[in-house]
Amino acid sequence: MSIAIETGLIIASIIGKHTDKMIEGLVNNTEGKTACKNWKTDDWGGYERVLSEEINHEIGKENTQRLERINGIVRQQTGRWHRRQNKFAKEWEETERISKLVISYYNWIWENSRLGTKAAERAELTDKKWDWHDSATYPTIF
């Protein structure tokens, strides 16, 4: 998962095992959405193999709590939404689709109880309060 730390906006997400191919997909998906050249990651060696030389790569636990909290919210909501859909499909692609819906919900509809704002508002992508109807009629899924 690729997150803008200042706003909490989820920029990109890839579902799968930790492989170089997965990291390449995450990097490619993130690069098209932001000009950020600073990556803070864990100590997994795949990042060093995949990230280009122009990217400032820092290894550390800084901001880990925020990333893990967002990851936990997305995992919990994906599990809830997926259980409601199990009678229709038990495929990996279904989990991926539901995860994209959950991330869209998190970015545009879910309001942070402490800050009182949504990630898209903090990133200045909108000044409007979004609801399910807005999300369904406007393409927000990445």
Provide a role label for each language-model segment:
Residues 1-142:
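Residue-level recognition of single "structural anchor" positions
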